[in-house]
Amino acid sequence: QAKIPCQPMKGARMKFYYPSPFLREMSDIDILIHGDFMEQAAVELEAMGYVLQQKIKHHDIYRKAPGIVVEAHRAMYDRTVDKRQYAYFSDLSRAVRRKGLLYVYDFEAEDFYIYMMAHMAKHFYKRGCGIRNLVDIYVFLEKFGGEMNADYLQKQFAGLGLTAFTEHMEKLARIWLQGEPGEAFYQQLFDYMQGCGIYGKDENGIWNRFCDAQPEKGEKGRDALKRWYWFPPYEYMVLYYPWLSRNPVAGKFLLPAAWGIRAVRGVVCGRGKYKREMLRQIDASQIGVRQDIYRRLQLRFH
């Protein structure tokens, strides 16, 4: 009614593919606001009784009593996670107008599935993700799998670096929900995801870069993980302390200073508390298991 171009995202659309929308739990309603309409969208949301709670990165969070949460997105993907996927999903031309509406857009089945898997991969990379995502994969493929363009999907997933991740997650969904046989790796992957809760856990954010940095047959014990956590390599630190990259040679000499700043911030701001707790408790054998999981999924985000 306000003539604001928008696109319902993620669960706001996925829930309607379940036998009943009530079977698909959502913590919030995600909607992409196209173009320069964020201010107008804010006015409309506030008029409907929503109160702005927080502005973070690529979306604004609104809440309305008793507990309805709307995330108004100005971008479909987080630039800080992977620049390649951010650029891909910044192209809104793949969306089409919803039938009978002028200002509401949707992806066709293929592009919705690509975004669904990219969003899942982002969460897995940053915090791990739960097994509800496997149900989404199963439900979506049961409904649309037979009609989607497989060549298009293969090409797009390859370009986004998501081929291995998608194949493993589809396989795990079939094992879990259709009884397909699978190797021990998939039980390990399922157990890890089950332990992540629905939305992942902060302490799991250590695995993506740690598993990337270790050699295939390198050390897998807790000591190696602790050393990596307390003294991350230059390639990791430069992501969070960009001033190291102004002069790469000098930056590597300044790496100890960045480690010190990071340690002080961790103590003062309480950052990394759950990671440190995990380092104290994790069984050494599980470090090797998680290294294997992240290596096989091949999420090389930059």
Give the positions of each predicted feature.
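Conserved NTP-donor binding/palm subdomain of two-metal-ion nucleotidyltransferases/polymerases, i.e.
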Residues: Q1-S27, I33-H302
